[in-house]
Amino acid sequence: MIYTLDQHRVKTVGDNFYIAPNATVLGQVELGEDVSVWFGAVIRGDVEKIIIGKGSNIQDLSVLHVDPGSPIIIGENVTVGHKVMLHGCTIGDNSLIGINSVILNNVEIGNNCLIGANTLLTEGTKIPDNSLVMGSVSYTHLRAHETDRH
């Protein structure tokens, strides 16, 4: 379903696109030719723009959202896998974002990249063209003192 938010209407390039009946697209969103948005996906351009390039697809249950000053720009022929969370990032042409990945504000992913399933890219990460990225790095932020343990 396409919704208008305030004065912002969703823009489409041509008539050749698909939005599943229970997908939600609203606000400052531009869909290129041959874009598809699948079941349960939410594309919410409420405070900044979201541009999805020609031939790209947003798979089931993915969420695209923005912050002021952090738009989402998705290049051409990009696949955003099932249950992906994109927030204020840029994705280059011919890239694939794997199932259940989380891409945070101001991340820049180059052209021809593969982001593996369940990958977390933290704010401001830059991924060069032709890269394969998988997993998420965690580290200890705080350790309890011996006397604090039960």
What are these regions (language model features)?
Residues 5, 19-20, 140:
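Intrinsically disordered, low-complexity regions enriched in small/polar residues
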